[in-house]
């Protein structure tokens, strides 16, 4: 008897991907489940076992927290990637890593296809499929949820008829995605852009009414653009981000309410919580202000915006992203130092920064008797700097006289 074809499924443990296991089996595939730990806090042993109980022939759980932190979230922090000026790319960052691991498992298992649980109207289907095809063009990509187009009731009926456990939180109105870089929430009342997000939509952050009335001061140390310690205590990067999620989250930092333009052409209202990400981006930017020369500091935002768009639009494995990262890496060589941040009532306020590579010279900046700036040099500088506009004005006046 011929061996059945294998498909590797990105498995979350939820209803959609559990139903997908059975559905793919009925299409003639042996299903290999693959679940990544990118810091969402799931019971992964439970998820791994559930996949096997539903019918997967094998079930992988991969601890990818540190890889996600160092190879993906770190880039977001160093590039200050804020899609449309607001969103630090929480879900968009994890998709290429998940795709990479799916392809690795597929190649190990000699699978012919990879499957995901995305719908047909979201960004993630694009991110997954473009990434998978970039890494292995020979793999087929299957999107069961997009293909079957069932209502929720039809999906539950299918699950019940095949003995698939129905999650107890199925009546939650929200669709949530979480990793160590933050938490994304949509659907339910959030689909009304006029409706205020209920407090139940949040999990990582406290409401301003419930935040401490006393500020908390922390010091974050960076080495070559990488955050390495908080208040002198060194952490692996993934743990440092998770620690900041907890610390900044209790002060209500990192809540983002965003009506964004999706890649597929529609607008979507999303509520994000990114306490660690927003605190780190704020602190890192201040250290760059201290250590980057003016020309680099002024040009870098153009690179940041392009990187934000590329990552959001699912082009992580593109030549342009690689080229932009080469520039980014060069800018981080001297971003070393300590930033002091006050966490209070939803704000991460930088109160101090220092670096051995600081380009700030107090003797040049001061207005005291210690001033070392050559004020007389300004006369010639101003004359030369304004010369083009001066000449332009002379020519225009001459034209007016002749007219």
Swiss-Prot record:
Query: Which residues are noted in the entry as L-citrulline-binding?
Result: 87, 123, 127, 175, 260, 272
Which top EC class applies here?
ligase
Q: Report the pathway entry.
A: Amino-acid biosynthesis; L-arginine biosynthesis; L-arginine from L-ornithine and carbamoyl phosphate: step 2/3
Q: What is its main location?
A: cytoplasm
Q: What are the protein's GO molecular function terms?
A: argininosuccinate synthase activity; ATP binding
Asked if the record carries the keyword Ligase, the reply is yes
* GO BP field: argininosuccinate metabolic process; L-arginine biosynthetic process; urea cycle
The entry describes its oligomerization and partners as: Homotetramer.
What family is it from? Belongs to the argininosuccinate synthase family. Type 1 subfamily.
Designated name of the protein:
Argininosuccinate synthase
Q: Which organism is it from?
A: Bacillus velezensis (strain DSM 23117 / BGSC 10A6 / LMG 26770 / FZB42)
């Amino acid at each position: 008897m011929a061996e059945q074809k294998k498909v590797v499924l990105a498995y979350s443990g939820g209803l959609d991907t559990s139903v997908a296991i059975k559905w793919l089996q009925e299409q003639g595939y042996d299903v290999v489940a693959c679940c990544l730990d990118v810091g969402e806090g799931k019971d992964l042993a439970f998820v791994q076992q559930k996949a096997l109980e539903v019918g997967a022939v094998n079930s992988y759980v991969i601890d990818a927290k540190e890889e996600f932190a160092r190879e993906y979230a770190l880039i977001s922090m160093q590039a200050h990637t804020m899609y449309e000026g607001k969103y630090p790319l929480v879900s968009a960052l994890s998709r290429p890593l998940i795709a990479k691991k799916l392809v690795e498992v597929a190649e190990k298992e000699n699978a012919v296809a990879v499957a995901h649980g995305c719908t047909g109207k979201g960004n993630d289907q694009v991110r997954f499929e473009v990434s998978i095809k970039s890494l292995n063009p020979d793999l087929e990509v299957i999107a069961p949820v997009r293909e079957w187009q069932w209502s929720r009731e039809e999906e539950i009926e299918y699950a019940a008829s095949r003995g698939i456990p129905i999650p107890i939180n199925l009546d939650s109105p929200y669709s949530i995605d979480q990793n160590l870089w933050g938490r994304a929430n949509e659907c339910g009342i959030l689909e009304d852009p006029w409706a205020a997000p209920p407090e139940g939509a949040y999990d990582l952050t406290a409401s301003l009414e419930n935040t401490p009335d006393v500020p908390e001061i922390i010091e974050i140390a960076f080495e070559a653009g990488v955050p390495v310690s908080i208040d002198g205590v060194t952490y692996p990067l993934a743990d440092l981000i998770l620690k900041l999620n907890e610390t900044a989250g209790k002060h209500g930092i990192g809540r983002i309410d965003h009506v964004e333009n999706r890649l597929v052409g529609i607008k979507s209202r999303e509520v994000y919580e990114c306490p660690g990400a927003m605190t780190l981006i704020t602190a890192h930017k201040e250290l760059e202000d201290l250590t980057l020369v003016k020309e680099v500091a002024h040009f870098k935002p153009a690179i940041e915006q392009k990187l934000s768009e590329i990552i959001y639009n699912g082009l992580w494995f593109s030549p342009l992203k690689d080229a932009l990262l080469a520039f980014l890496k060069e800018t981080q060589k001297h971003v070393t130092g300590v930033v002091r941040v006050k966490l209070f009532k939803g704000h991460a306020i930088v109160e101090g920064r220092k670096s051995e590579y600081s380009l700030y010279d107090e003797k040049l900046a001061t207005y005291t008797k210690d001033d070392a700036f050559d004020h007389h040099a300004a006369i010639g500088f101003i004359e030369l700097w304004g010369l083009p506009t001066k000449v332009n004005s002379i020519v225009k006046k001459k034209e007016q006289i002749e007219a």
